[in-house]
């Protein structure tokens, strides 16, 4: 698959939150919505509750690295937003990748589904 693009506009994030499906676990929350561009676009959100800027940026780097490992398994045409939770700060890239794989499988972005709760947004 081609390299992913980054979600940058607030309207893109809001549309993904509002219309997309979500999957969550203690480490990460994932929102996914089909897009019309045929390109994978991702956004990463880290709130101030996670810690100072150094910790938030570390979380973003780890999430990006974990997604790069799964990028080849994902099909294009999705907007995906990853929301870091408090436990993300203390986890390694492999733990986040495992969590991400389960969630993306449950949302239908990749072909694996392994016991993750999926909520459909109205």
Residue ranges and their predicted role:
Residues 1-122:
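Positively charged, solvent-exposed patches that mediate nucleic-acid binding
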């Amino acid at each position: 698959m081609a390299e992913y693009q980054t979600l940058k506009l607030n309207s893109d994030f809001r549309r993904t939150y509002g219309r997309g499906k979500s999957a969550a676990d203690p480490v990460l929350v994932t929102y996914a919505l089909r897009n019309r561009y045929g390109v994978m676009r991702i956004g990463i959100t880290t709130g101030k509750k996670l810690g100072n800027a150094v910790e938030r940026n570390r979380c973003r780097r780890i999430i990006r690295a974990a997604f790069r490992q799964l990028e080849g398994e994902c099909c294009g045409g999705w907007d995906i937003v990853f929301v870091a939770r408090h436990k993300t700060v203390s986890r390694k890239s492999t733990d986040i990748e495992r969590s991400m794989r389960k969630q993306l499988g449950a949302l239908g972005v990749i072909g694996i589904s392994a016991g993750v709760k999926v909520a459909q947004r109205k």
